[in-house]
C-alpha cells in the first residue's frame, strides 16, 4: 500500500504507529500544505463525484460554524454568506449541534456572526460574484437578527 501511494501521489505521508489497534494513517495530496487529515466522522454520507469523496454542504456549514464559534476568518464569513441564501440560522445551528454536540454554544455562535475583529485584518478573497466585505458584514448582522 505504501509503495502504491508514494508512486501515485506527489506527497504521501505514512503514519508511524506501533500500536496495532490504532491502525495506519495515510496523508496524500499534491503537497503537504494541500493535504487534508481529518479524523471526525461525517454527519452525512460523503458525496462521491468521479471517485472523489467530498463533504456535503451541510457538513461544511457545521465546520464553518465551528470556526465562527472561535472568531472566524474573512473567508469563513464569505462562505457562510453564500450559504445564507439556502439555509436559515436555525438550520445552520442544528447542523453544528449535530456535528459538535459537546462544544455547541448557540449564543456564542450567534454573537460571533457579527464579530469581525479577527476577520477585518484578513485580505479579501477574490470573489467571482463581485461581493464586497462591508456588504457581507451587514448581511451577516441582518441574518442573525432575522434568525
Where do the language-model regions lie?
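Compositionally biased terminal segments of proteins
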Residues: 1-147
Amino acid at each position: 500500500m505504501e509503495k502504491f501511494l508514494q508512486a501515485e501521489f506527489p506527497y504521501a505521508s505514512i503514519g508511524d504507529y506501533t500500536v496495532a489497534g490504532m491502525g495506519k494513517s495515510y496523508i496524500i495530496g499534491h503537497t503537504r500544505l494541500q493535504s487534508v487529515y481529518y479524523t471526525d466522522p461525517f454527519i452525512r454520507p460523503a458525496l462521491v463525484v468521479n471517485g472523489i469523496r467530498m463533504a456535503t454542504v451541510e457538513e461544511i456549514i457545521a465546520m464553518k460554524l465551528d470556526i465562527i464559534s472561535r472568531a472566524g476568518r474573512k473567508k469563513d464569513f464569505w462562505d457562510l454568506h453564500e450559504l445564507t441564501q439556502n439555509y436559515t440560522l436555525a438550520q445552520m445551528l442544528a447542523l453544528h449541534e449535530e456535528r459538535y454536540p459537546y462544544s455547541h454554544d448557540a449564543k456564542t455562535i450567534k454573537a460571533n456572526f457579527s464579530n469581525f475583529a479577527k476577520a477585518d485584518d484578513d485580505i479579501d478573497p477574490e470573489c467571482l460574484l463581485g461581493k464586497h466585505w462591508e456588504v457581507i458584514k451587514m448581511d451577516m448582522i441582518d441574518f442573525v437578527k432575522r434568525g
